[in-house]
Amino acid sequence: MSNLNDFNREAKAALWVALQWLLLAVPTGLVCGAVGTAFHLSVEYVTELRAAQSWLLLCLPLAGLAIVALYKVTKCEGVGTNNVIRAVQSGEPVSLLLVPAIFLGTVLTHLCGGSAGREGAALQMGGSIGWNVGKLLHLSDYVRRTATISGMAAFFSALFGTPLTAALFAMMVEDVGLTFTSAFMPAFTSALIAYGVSLFFGIAPTNFVLNSIPHLTLETALQTALLGIACAAVTRLFCWTLHTLEHGIPKRIPNPWLRAFAGGAAVVAFSYLFGVGRYNGAGMAVIADAVEQGVALPWDFLCKIFLTALTLAVGFKGGEVVPSFYIGATFGCAFGPLLGLPAGFAGAIGLVCVFCGATNALIPSILLGFELFGGQGLELIALGCGVCYMLSGHHGLYSSQLFVTEKLLSEYTESWGKRFRK
């Protein structure tokens, strides 16, 4: 009888937790889906407007001043994706004012041609919305962290139409080697709801068609492994450039107003020197050309690395994830044929590999390859990801990311041990 009572108590407790997750996931998914849809449409509109009105690029220095003012008014100076990651790790609060700040800042950046993505902004907005939904519902600190993960997953899903990748990425990006499995159902539910909202408003999921897919053989496996090694080197270069400029430029130009104006002018000059439009914005058209048509310039990835690092270092907003797609796709497309791989397929491998190495999220990266390319060539994509992940080092886009285990050894890191002992 006692066993039956224990079973009933456990069942009731589980039902109550499931109800809590549902109460959390539904509003988070709806709000993030709506805001994410508005954000997607806004960025898409200003990107088309800039393409039609090329003179808008000349306004980038002024846009930089407007972004500095916006962040001062909202008191969000210095707040970014690292703060959202820390909100999951330690319960650090995230201001709701971050949502309008990063929304408008990213739209201004894309309107005037800054080289940035949108997923970093999505993680910030989603994390902020999720954390504040948890606060509004008076949830415990632990559950509020789950709400933050759910918001990140929902916003990512609304923008890219990849709900499974979004949920796993939001669960795993904070602590490398640790999966916040209890957050899966609320995160995945929020991601599905947000995805449904974006579909309702006519936003098609991001996917690519691969025209030439080699069979899995010993030869293609070796070629893919070599490409994965090269992508690891590119990932290290991207992260090093990003962090070097983000730390170096503010030291050289401590005044944020001057930094934004001068940095914006430098981005404009670079764009006119190397090609207006090709390296500005997120670059989804260039990514599509590299993956679907097998067309990219050999220096595309280097130009995108520098211009993205410069754009973000001087104070413009957006993200690093889509630029990592661009860098990987163009590098793979240009370098892959030298190894004997089809250019487009090598671009697909490069896209996923550099994303994997830059975010240190192995399983979500493989799932991303499945959702973006429909499962085509998944074994080779997974192989490339594994090699790149293993060799890209303990670096990444997010400095607050904590490595729980070593990449090459099944051992806990010293930093994780210190945190665990606390």
Predicted regions and their residues:
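Alpha-helical transmembrane segments and immediately membrane-proximal extracytoplasmic
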Residues: M1-K422
